[in-house]
């Protein structure tokens, strides 16, 4: 799983920057920005790793002796550490702009090691700083930038923005048989739009979204002039992939879910978002079709979905009416999924440390 990083400026962002000389070279100049420590703790808990990156003009020269810098800086680091804030690394450019070095922000020399790592989640990593050069650094790194300001984008605002859940995924799957576009919003309800060309299948997919408590949009163009096989199978593959992507690092999810009855049917569903695809399925139908959906494709749909989503899924139904039996499977799955994707904390629900 790729890692989220926050590359954070020091003066003017973590601590106040003296307007007189822009140097924190005495203990009485050291002052933390409002709310910085609790918000950094919140961000760490949400899975971000912290890296401090700062330009310190002329550090080690007569105008800014190293000893004058070290005292306040070391105290700052001790306070952060004592409160549980851990920086993976502190990156410092000591040069003046006139030196034309290759490590001064917004140049990327200091962060080249992170850029070389395939493990960095660039879509969810940020540079946070109070200057235009910090935003330029973010652009040069190919990640997001947040310009800190006490009034317009302060630490509580940043903490809220970066920890607010809005799990989303967009998957496009094109083959010779089907063209499929799936969007999933796990933290929004209502407004689902589904068009696969198979009316009863659309109704069943809507049951997953409705009872799962999330929104999805699915558009499919398939070779229905042959039959519904490729349409149903490939929709399952695309939807499973979208759900997996939307779940992200899975921190805080319940992971497990189970549900039982519907009408005269007894539908059993047990789900584990385990990362290990497996399906146990038991359902018998009187007819080959319900509406325009082939009943033999129902198992195929759930098998395809469980494979790309990476879940262990047990589904079973008994009843008298084929329509109700089919619907009970989709409703039970949706309701079970609702339990499993619900966020209750910040930790990964696995003793192995990975899902």
From Swiss-Prot:
Zn(2+) binds at residues 93, 95, 101, 103. GO terms for cellular component: cytoplasm. Pathway: Amino-acid biosynthesis; L-histidine biosynthesis; L-histidine from 5-phospho-alpha-D-ribose 1-diphosphate: step 6/9; Amino-acid biosynthesis; L-histidine biosynthesis; L-histidine from 5-phospho-alpha-D-ribose 1-diphosphate: step 8/9. Its cofactor is Mg(2+); Zn(2+). It is found in: Cytoplasm. GO terms for biological process: L-histidine biosynthetic process. Disulfide bonds: none annotated. Its main location: cytoplasm. GO terms for molecular function: histidinol-phosphatase activity; imidazoleglycerol-phosphate dehydratase activity; metal ion binding. The active site is at 9 (nucleophile), 11 (proton donor). NCBIfam families: HAD-SF-IIIA, hisB_Nterm, Histidinol-ppas, PRK00951.2-1, PRK00951.2-4, PRK05446.1. This is Histidine biosynthesis bifunctional protein HisB. It comes from Shigella flexneri. The lineage of its organism: Bacteria, Pseudomonadati, Pseudomonadota, Gammaproteobacteria, Enterobacterales. The gene is hisB.
């Amino acid at each position: 799983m790729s890692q989220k990083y926050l590359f954070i400026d020091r003066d003017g962002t973590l601590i106040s920057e003296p307007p007189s000389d822009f140097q924190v070279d005495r203990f009485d100049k050291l002052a933390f920005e409002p709310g910085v420590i609790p918000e950094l703790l919140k961000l760490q808990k949400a899975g971000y790793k912290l890296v401090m990156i700062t330009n310190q003009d002329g550090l080690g020269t007569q105008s800014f002796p190293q000893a004058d810098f070290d005292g306040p800086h070391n105290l700052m680091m001790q306070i952060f550490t004592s409160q549980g804030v851990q920086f993976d690394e502190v990156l410092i450019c000591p040069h003046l702009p006139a030196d034309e070095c290759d490590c001064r922000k917004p140049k990327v020399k200091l962060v080249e090691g992170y850029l070389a790592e395939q493990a960095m989640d660039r879509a969810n990593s940020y540079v946070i700083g109070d200057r235009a050069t910090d935003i330029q650094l973010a652009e040069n790194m190919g990640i997001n930038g947040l310009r800190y300001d006490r009034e317009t984008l302060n630490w509580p605002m940043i903490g809220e923005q970066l920890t607010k859940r809005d799990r989303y995924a967009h998957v496009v799957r094109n083959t010779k048989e089907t063209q499929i576009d799936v969007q999933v919003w796990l933290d929004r309800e209502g407004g689902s739009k589904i068009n696969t060309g198979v009316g009863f299948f659309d109704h069943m997919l809507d049951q997953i979204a409705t009872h799962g408590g999330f929104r999805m949009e699915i558009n499919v163009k398939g070779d229905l002039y042959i039959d519904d096989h490729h349409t149903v199978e490939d929709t399952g593959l695309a939807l499973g992939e979208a759900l997996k992507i939307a779940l992200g690092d899975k921190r805080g999810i319940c992971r497990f879910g189970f549900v039982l009855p519907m009408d005269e049917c007894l539908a059993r569903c047990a789900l584990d978002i385990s990362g290990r695809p497996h399906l146990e399925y038991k359902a018998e139908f009187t007819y080959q079709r319900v509406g325009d959906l082939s009943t033999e494709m129902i198992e195929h749909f759930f098998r395809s979905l469980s494979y790309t989503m990476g879940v262990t899924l047990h589904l079973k139904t008994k009843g008298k009416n084929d329509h109700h039996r089919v619907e009970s499977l989709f409703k039970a799955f949706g309701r079970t999924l609702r339990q499993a994707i619900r966020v209750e904390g910040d930790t990964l629900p696995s003793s192995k440390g990975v899902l």
